[in-house]
């Protein structure tokens, strides 16, 4: 009924073209190419064709140029910088090392000509590979004459500098750098910031934003010398540049460069200081040149700038070497003609113990935090729990730890800290100004390079002076009613009030010397200091009346019978060691001040007054001391009168570990102290810490329970280690109408153990409050750390359970650094004094000066 339809067979598209053809049988050893293989083959052929074209261009078109460059060999002197000496703590822990890195350099004279594609290729390749930043520079030659300060001030405004002191410092830096540089680098920017500053700089003559590569090339005084573009380049980037070196004329790579590294971190920054790029002013300094006027330093060398790195520069830097080589036109060495190997610097081993230094620094920072929180922030923190530390009032201080037996400096902590690693490759002007204009001055070592009124800690030495001059004895007693009232010479009805710190409680009553030290009575020491003397025009000798602070009433009349300023000066300056440098191996040590009438007349053109003497008697007024001076003099009380020069250096060693020079203990002075006088003062200091009414013994909590101030050094249940000390609170700042002051410095100085002294700890907090409340807890932690070091207390409370890793017994200059071919060892006797090695014969190591 229905016809069937014939189905049309379906052929896949790939088989239709073969329809009707006989199938081709393929052998197993035959290779058949599809379309992809043909494309790949074409790409390979094209690549080889391009390579052949480039090679043809180089060999045929540019062949003569490359042949001439290769044949153009010259002889060149290449200086070799010595390995800088390393620095270790007393246990051999590394404090300053040399880290081996890759560096990229440029020889401006070997760069292709300006304006050529080859020059731009080199420039863009290096900038891209190294990610070089844009920098703001001033060209002094392009600034109109007479407009320098105006332009520089506008640059300061451009950078956002607002404080007058900051701007003045910026102007000073730019002015000095303009004397020695074609271009003065001011700051560097990210890629996002650069366009904004570039646009703003167009309105200022002589000011421009350029890449660091261009700055380094244009600022080079000697184009034939290589200049460091960047140090600490990754190996991958260095290898990439090395592989393309044929296309980068003028660019050199060095895989043996050393960068100074400070593994101990910021806790050692004030002791070590830092190195930084040498500037022309330093190169031209006669102290940094040979007798023939040749500088020890090349243009891109580093030099000690601060701390031990500066003080011991001549020892650490070693002796420069170099080699004469033959180089081709591309700067590649082809033959060594002559070599004078550099001599490495000597290593230094310090008296500092890194564990104790770190513990002292931590205790100091925590103590400042507590001082601010306890005095100012309790109520504020309730409202704002996230209050930042930078809003706190007290922000600076110091801790000094000395061995009383030999003057060894075991710890020298200063706060605030700073990052000395930032200076190694050259700190930016902006960051440097941040440091220098910080009101707490982080770059200043508060322990040795700054001085302050010492407050009642001076009473230790006033007591010794009074006993020595026989103005007081063991039985001397004075009554404190809360203060004294001293009438004017010209008007007995008017006068000045001098209060005791315990004025709110009505004073101390009648005290002898030991009790006056124990309770730190100011009135007692007003009497020790103020002399029996009749001022010119006065009706009678210097006198005072008892003052009752609560009612402002005056009581009985008393005549002074004390030392007077001249005897105070003679004892504090000429017997003890105030008002003069201690000689510690650090630059810029402050000397303090022991004032006298001649000094005041020279400075203020005023005569000396009884009030000046009264203030000096309790460590205030004009008197100034460094925390280091206080520690040195406290050590003399502990050891029986020996004033040691504080010693930071134990020895120097060469790269073989052999001792070259040992720094011996040095006595500055032996103070003749009578045994009975010394016993009285020591007893007073012992009572300060160990008697309930002593200012450093304890404090009552909210429940009226007396709580010890020594929970770390002398915890309950353990054998007590007796400590002797003296608190101090120096009032400073604006004087209020009631005779008190706005701020006060906190001090505490102590030694331990009492019977057989080993250690002195001195604590200072700038504007830190009362010494008994805020300096004593810091000393408690530091003493505990020392006791843990010596085994007198178990480790783990302050120090780690396990000790910090100890370095090699005899570390080498290349410790932690792999250097091919060890440098020649330093001779045991001294450095090579030949002119070739640039050693200054007029300044041997033992005569290093500030």
Predicted regions and their residues:
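Membrane-proximal periplasmic segments of bacterial cell-envelope enzymes
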Residues: 1-343, 354-358, 362-398, 404, ...
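Short, charged, low-complexity patches
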Residues: 119, 349, 353, 357, ...
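Short alpha-helical interdomain "coupling" segment at the junction between an upstream regulatory sensor module
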Residues: 794-798
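A generic structural motif
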Residues: 110-111, 766-769
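Ligand-binding clefts of soluble mixed alpha/beta catalytic domains
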Residues: 801-805, 847
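Short, hydrophobic alpha-helical segments
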Residues: 368, 638, 786-790
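Beta-lactam-recognizing serine transpeptidase/beta-lactamase-like catalytic domain environment
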Residues: 142-149, 153, 159, 163, ...
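C-terminal, active-site-flanking charged/polar segments
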Residues: 127, 653-654, 755-757, 769, ...
């Amino acid at each position: 009924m229905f016809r069937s339809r014939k189905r049309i067979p379906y052929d896949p598209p790939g088989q239709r073209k073969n329809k009707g053809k006989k199938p081709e049988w393929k052998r197993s050893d035959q290779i058949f190419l599809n379309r992809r293989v043909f494309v790949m083959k074409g790409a390979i052929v094209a690549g080889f064709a391009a390579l052949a074209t480039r090679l043809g261009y180089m060999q045929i078109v540019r062949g003569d140029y490359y042949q001439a460059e290769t044949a153009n060999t010259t002889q060149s002197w290449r200086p070799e910088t010595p390995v800088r000496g390393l620095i270790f703590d007393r246990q051999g822990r590394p404090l300053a090392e040399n880290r081996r890195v890759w560096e990229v350099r440029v020889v401006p004279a070997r760069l292709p000509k300006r304006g050529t594609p080859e020059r731009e290729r080199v420039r863009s390749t290096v900038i891209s590979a190294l990610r070089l930043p844009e920098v703001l520079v001033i060209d002094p030659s392009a600034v109109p004459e007479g407009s320098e300060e105006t332009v520089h001030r506008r640059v300061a405004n451009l950078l956002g500098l607002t404080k007058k002191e900051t701007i003045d410092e910026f102007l000073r830096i730019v002015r000095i750098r303009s004397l020695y540089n074609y271009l003065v680098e001011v700051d560097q920017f990210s890629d996002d910031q650069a366009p904004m500053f570039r646009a703003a700089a167009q309105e200022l003559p002589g000011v421009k934003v350029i890449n660091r590569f261009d700055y380094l090339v244009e600022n080079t005084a000697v184009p034939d010398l290589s200049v460091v573009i960047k140090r600490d380049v990754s190996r991958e980037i260095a290898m990439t540049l090395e592989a393309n070196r044929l296309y980068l004329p003028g660019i050199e790579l060095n895989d043996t460069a050393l960068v100074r590294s400070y593994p101990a971190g910021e806790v050692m920054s004030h002791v070590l200081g830092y190195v930084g790029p040498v500037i022309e002013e330093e190169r031209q300094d006669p102290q940094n040149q040979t007798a023939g006027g040749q500088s020890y330093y090349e243009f891109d060398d580093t030099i000690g700038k601060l701390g031990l790195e500066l003080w011991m520069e001549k020892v650490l830097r070693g002796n420069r070497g170099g080699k004469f080589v033959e180089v081709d036109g591309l700067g590649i060495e082809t033959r060594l003609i002559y070599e004078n190997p550099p001599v490495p610097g000597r290593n230094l081993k310090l008296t500092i113990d890194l564990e104790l230094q770190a513990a002292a620094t931590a205790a100091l920072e925590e103590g400042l935090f507590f001082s601010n929180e306890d005095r100012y922030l309790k109520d504020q923190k309730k409202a704002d729990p996230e209050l930042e530390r930078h809003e706190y009032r007290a922000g600076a201080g110091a801790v000094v730890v000395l061995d009383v037996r030999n003057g060894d400096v075991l710890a020298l902590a200063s706060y605030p800290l700073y990052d000395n690693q930032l200076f190694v490759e050259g700190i930016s002007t902006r960051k440097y100004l941040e440091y220098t204009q910080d009101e707490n001055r982080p770059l200043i070592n508060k322990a040795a390079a700054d001085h302050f009124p010492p407050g009642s800690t001076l009473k230790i030495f006033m007591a010794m002076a009074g006993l020595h001059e026989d103005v007081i004895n063991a039985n001397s007693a004075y009554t404190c009613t809360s203060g004294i009232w001293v009438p004017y010479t010209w008007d007995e009805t008017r006068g000045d009030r001098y209060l005791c710190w315990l004025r709110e409680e009505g004073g101390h009553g009648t005290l002898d010397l030991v009790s006056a030290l124990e309770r730190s009575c100011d009135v007692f020491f007003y009497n020790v200091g103020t002399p029996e003397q009749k001022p010119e025009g006065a009706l009678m000798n210097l006198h005072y009346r008892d003052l009752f602070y609560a009612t402002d009433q005056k009581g009985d009349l008393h005549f002074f019978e004390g030392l007077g300023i001249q005897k105070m000066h003679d004892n504090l300056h000429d017997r003890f060691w105030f008002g003069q440098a201690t000689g510690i191996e650090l630059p810029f040590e402050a000397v303090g001040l022991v004032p006298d009438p001649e000094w005041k007349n020279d400075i203020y053109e005023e005569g000396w007054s009884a009030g000046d003497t009264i203030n000096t008697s309790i460590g205030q007024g004009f008197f100034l001391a460094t925390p280091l001076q206080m520690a040195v003099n406290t050590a003399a009380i502990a050891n029986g009168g020996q004033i040691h020069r504080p010693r930071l250096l134990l020895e120097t060693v060469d790269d073989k570990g052999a001792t070259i020079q040992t720094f011996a203990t040095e006595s500055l002075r032996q103070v003749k102290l009578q045994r009975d006088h010394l016993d009285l003062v020591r007893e007073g200091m012992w009572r300060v810490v160990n008697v309930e009414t002593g200012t450093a013994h304890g404090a009552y909590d909210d429940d009226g329970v007396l709580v010890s101030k020594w929970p770390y050094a002398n915890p309950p249940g353990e054998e007590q280690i007796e400590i002797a000390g003296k608190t101090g609170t120096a009032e400073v700042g604006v004087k209020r109408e009631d005779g008190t002051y706005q701020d006060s410095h906190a001090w505490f100085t102590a030694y331990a153990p009492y019977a057989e002294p080993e250690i002195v700890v001195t604590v200072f907090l700038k504007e830190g409050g009362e010494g008994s409340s805020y300096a004593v807890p810091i000393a408690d932690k530091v003493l505990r750390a020392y006791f843990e070091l010596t085994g007198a207390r178990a480790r783990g409370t302050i120090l780690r359970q396990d000790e910090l890793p100890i370095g090699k017994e005899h570390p080498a200059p290349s410790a932690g650094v792999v250097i091919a071919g060890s440098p020649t060892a330093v001779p045991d006797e001294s450095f090579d004094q030949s002119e070739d090695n640039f050693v200054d014969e007029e300044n041997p190591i033992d005569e290093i000066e500030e």
